[in-house]
Amino acid sequence: MYYLSDLSHYAFFTYISVRAGFAFFIALCLSLFLMPKFITWAKAKNASQPIYEYAPETHKTKCHTPTMGGLIFISSAVIASLFCIKFDNIFAISALLCLILFCLIGLIDDLGKVLKKDNHSGLSPRMKLLAQIIAGLICILPLYFSSELSTELFIPFYKHPLFDMEIFAIAFWILVLISSSNAVNLTDGLDGLATVPSIFSLSTLGIFLYLSGNLNYSEYLLLPKIQGLGEVVIICAALIGALMGFLWYNCYPAQVFMGDSGSLALGGFIGFLAIISKNEILLLLIGFVFVLETVSVILQVGSFKIFNKRVFKMAPIHHHFEKVGWVENKIIVRFWMIALLSNLLALASIKLR
C-alpha cells in the first residue's frame, strides 16, 4: 500500500496513521470473516481444548470448545500487515518474524494436545523453551548486529539511560521475550481474559513506538529517538483489529479459544515491542495482569516445594478467585479494569520524566 504513492501525486499512503488504519480494518474484517468458518471446521474435526483434570468444575463444560483460534487472528494480522508495511524496514520485518515464529511454536504445542486429547501432551517444557530461545535469537540478532537497536537500558519516569548493556543485552532481551510469551500463555485461562489486556498493551506500546519513531515528538517528550520504529505501529494496529474480530467469538461464553498458537505469539510480540521501544522495564506495568498471573504461579510452586504449603487455592490466580466463589465473568471484567488502569499509568510516564 505504501508503494501506491509512487503511482500518484499524493502522499496519502505514505502516512503511518493512514496505513495503520487500513491494516486495522483489513485484519478486523479478515478475522470476523474467517473465525466462524474455522470454528465450524474445528468442531467437525473435534479440534477442541483438552481440559486440565484439576481445573474448576465450571471448566468441564468447555471441553468441546474449539481451540487454535490464534492461528486465524495471527494470520489475519500478518496478511493485513503485508499489504500496508514498507518491506525495507528491519523493525517491521523482525516484528512479523517474531509473530510468525512464536505462533508456529504454539501451533505445534496445540496440535500435540489436540491430537492426543491430553493437556500434558504437546511440546515438553524444555523443547518449548529451546524453541523460544531460537525464535528470539532469529528476531533479535539482526537488529543487534545492524546497530539499529540501542543496547541502553531505560527505566520509567527517567529520561536518561541507566547504562549500556552491550553484548549482555541479547540475553536480557531473550529473557524479556520468553517471560512475556509465557506470561500471556498463563493468563489465557478464562474467556477473553488474555485478549483484552493484550489489546490494551498493544495500544500502549503502539503509542510509544509512534512517538519514539517520530524525531520531533521523541525530542519534545524526551523519549529514545529510533528512526523507522513507527512502521511497526502498522503491525500493532493490524493485530489489534484481528484481536477485536477474535474477541467477538472469544468473549464469555467463548465459542473458540486462542490456544498456545495465539497466546505465545501475543506474549512474544508484546515483549518484542517493549524491547524495540526501550520499555523493557515499563513492560512490568504495561503487562501488569500478565505479571500478576505469572508471579502467582511462581509463589504457588515455590511455596509448595519449600514449605509444602499453597499460597492460593489454585494458580494462576484467576483460578483462585474461581475457587473462592467469584463467577467467571466478574473475574474477567475486573482483570480488564486492572489492565486498563495499569496501561493508563504506563502512558502517564511519557510526561513524567
UniProtKB/Swiss-Prot annotation:
GO CC annotations, alphabetized: plasma membrane
Transmembrane segment boundaries: 22-42, 65-85, 88-108, 129-149, 161-181, 192-212, 228-248, 256-276, 281-301, 330-350
Oxidoreductase as UniProt keyword: no
Gene Ontology biological process terms from the UniProt entry: cell division; cell wall organization; peptidoglycan biosynthetic process; regulation of cell shape
Pathways per UniProt: Cell wall biogenesis; peptidoglycan biosynthesis
Any one GO molecular function term: phospho-N-acetylmuramoyl-pentapeptide-transferase activity
EC number: 2.7.8.13
Reactions it catalyzes: UDP-N-acetyl-alpha-D-muramoyl-L-alanyl-gamma-D-glutamyl-meso-2,6-diaminopimeloyl-D-alanyl-D-alanine + di-trans,octa-cis-undecaprenyl phosphate = di-trans,octa-cis-undecaprenyl diphospho-N-acetyl-alpha-D-muramoyl-L-alanyl-D-glutamyl-meso-2,6-diaminopimeloyl-D-alanyl-D-alanine + UMP
Superkingdom of the source species: Bacteria
Record keyword Transmembrane present: yes
EC category name: transferase
Cofactor(s) essential for the protein: Mg(2+)
Topology relative to the membrane: Multi-pass membrane protein
InterPro entries for this protein: Glycosyl_transferase_4 (IPR000715), PNAcMuramoyl-5peptid_Trfase (IPR003524), PNAcMuramoyl-5peptid_Trfase_CS (IPR018480)
Keywords assigned: Cell cycle, Cell division, Cell inner membrane, Cell membrane, Cell shape, Cell wall biogenesis/degradation, Magnesium, Membrane, Metal-binding, Peptidoglycan synthesis, Transferase, Transmembrane, Transmembrane helix
Subcellular location: Cell inner membrane
Its job: Catalyzes the initial step of the lipid cycle reactions in the biosynthesis of the cell wall peptidoglycan: transfers peptidoglycan precursor phospho-MurNAc-pentapeptide from UDP-MurNAc-pentapeptide onto the lipid carrier undecaprenyl phosphate, yielding undecaprenyl-pyrophosphoryl-MurNAc-pentapeptide, known as lipid I.
Family: Belongs to the glycosyltransferase 4 family. MraY subfamily.
Name of the protein in question: Phospho-N-acetylmuramoyl-pentapeptide-transferase
Source organism per UniProt: Campylobacter jejuni (strain RM1221)
Gene expressing this chain: mraY
